[in-house]
Regions:
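Mid-domain Rossmann-like dinucleotide-binding core that forms the NAD(H)/NADP(H) cofactor-binding site
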Residues: 1-66
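Short conserved AdoMet
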Residues: 34-35, 97-98, 182
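C-terminal hydrophobic helical "lid"/dimerization subdomain
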Residues: 65, 90, 134-192
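A short acidic, Gly/Pro-enriched loop at the edge of an enzyme's catalytic core
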Residues: 67-76
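Redox-cofactor binding/interface segments in oxidoreductases and associated redox assembly factors
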Residues: 77-78, 104
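Glycine-rich phosphate-binding loop and adjacent beta-alpha segment
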Residues: 84-152, 190-192
């Protein structure tokens, strides 16, 4: 839905979020839109999670990065959601070049404060996205023929399924998922 993901003077794209939404966004930007590793930057809070991105993106911990001093990023995808949305959005505002675009993809139930002064001074554009268009869906289906993209997406698939025979099995699976917030998806196999 973006006309320009990059520009000649701002060739880089950044993603905030080392979870599954950030991973899906990063793989799509690399394998579908052709953003190379040097120009695809992923920021996260957990080094172990960032390691999954290192085959196709440059990674940085948010705690160790000077967002105000960096230049060259035209588009930022905020994929953190939850309590981290506010800091990620404001770090994105600090990072992004003038006339840049910030896409909000992370979901939070709370209102977040943003640095509107810098949004106005830089002339930034914000948009929200949680659904794909027909054209994007068609691009995705075509991209699935790429074996490297398939392999990258397999990183989200868990090794085991939860076998659900009754409501106590379902409760156990949900409690376990909530207690261990890894970024792989939870698969439930119902035997009802």
């Amino acid at each position: 839905q973006l006309d320009e993901i990059t520009t000649e003077t701002s060739p880089q794209v950044a993603i905030f979020g080392d979870g599954p939404v950030g991973y899906l966004a990063a793989t799509a930007l690399h394998y579908i839109y052709g953003i190379d590793k040097a120009n695809l930057i992923v920021f996260g809070a957990v080094q172990e999670k960032l390691a999954a991105f290192e085959d196709f993106a440059t990674t940085h911990l948010v705690f160790d990065f000077d967002f105000n001093q960096y230049r060259g990023v035209h588009t930022v995808f905020e994929c953190t959601g939850g309590k981290f949305s506010e800091s990620a959005i404001n770090q994105a505002i600090d990072l992004i070049d003038r006339q840049g675009h910030i896409v909000l993809m992370g979901v939070t139930e709370e209102r977040v404060g943003i640095n509107t002064r810098d949004v106005l001074e830089k002339g930034l554009t914000f948009s929200g996205s949680s659904r794909s268009t027909k054209r994007e869906f068609e691009q995705l289906i075509h991209a699935f023929s790429n074996k490297q993209y398939q392999q990258a997406l397999r990183q989200l698939i868990p090794e085991a399924y939860y076998h659900i025979h009754d409501t106590s099995d379902l409760k156990e699976a949900m409690d376990d998922t909530a207690a261990h917030k890894g970024w792989k998806k939870t698969y439930l196999q119902y035997h009802w």
